[in-house]
Amino acid sequence: MDVAAHLTEMRARAREFGTRYAVAETGLRASRRLTQWLEDTLLEMEGSRGVLGPAHEQWRDNSTAENRRRWNEWDWSTKGEEWNASESWKEALIEDVMLPVIPTGGTVLEIGPGGGRWSVVLAPRAKKLIVVDVAQKPLEVVAERLGDADNLECLLSDGASLTGVDDHSVDSIWSFDVFVHIRPRDQAAYLSEIARVLKPGGVAAIHHSDGRNRGDAPSREGWRAPMSAPLFASLAHERGLEVDKQLREWSAGQHDLGAFHDVITVLRAPLR
């Protein structure tokens, strides 16, 4: 809102409720904008330094309860395919990012399968596919979509752990369009669990945010949780995982992660 429009609205409020009310309301709006700016500034500073500081730890949105409600109520009729930038974008992501880190055979774990748009690619490659989600509805959608697949196991998550998955039992992990909606402290908890369940030499490819004020989209769009490439790498290292690479584009730069400028971090469990 420009200054002239703001003054016009303030005068209207003063006529309707009185000057004191108008001044108080204006102050409240300014205070909220300042609070948001301070929060974004702290998040940016912590993220750039790779520190899980108070701004990240105290992040209020993107809780387990909110995620469970949102994805149980979501319209999964298009199976999550509406989030693909294009069919060629999806095919290139599969060929150039997913398949190189997901070996044929073995046990594959997918965190947050959504409507199963990646599960249908992973299932034929895996000896066993474990899909974990915080909401029951996506698990039902995936089970229906994969039909008679006899290598599928569906697990309901508490939003921060991989309960039901044995230690060092998983060869590879895939998660896309999921961690961007998980609050930072729960992302950290999931990384601890990833370190626990991966076999030595196992690989995980995790798509996550890279800052809240980068890219072409406003910082508050998309119901997204704050994270950064340096912070995610730092959290992974603290849990004994190796960062193999962090991708922002693929197919020789033909495709990327869109307006939010996210990152796919490829992690590896060290050989023991």
What residue ranges belong to the model's regions?
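A short SAM/SAH-binding and catalytic strip from SAM-dependent methyltransferases
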Residues: 172-185
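Class I (Rossmann-like) S-adenosyl-L-methionine-dependent methyltransferase catalytic domain
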Residues: 1-105, 109-164, 182-189, 193, ...
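A short acidic, Gly/Pro-enriched loop at the edge of an enzyme's catalytic core
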Residues: 163-173
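Short, cationic motifs built from Arg/Lys/His that form the positively charged side of catalytic pockets
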Residues: 196-199
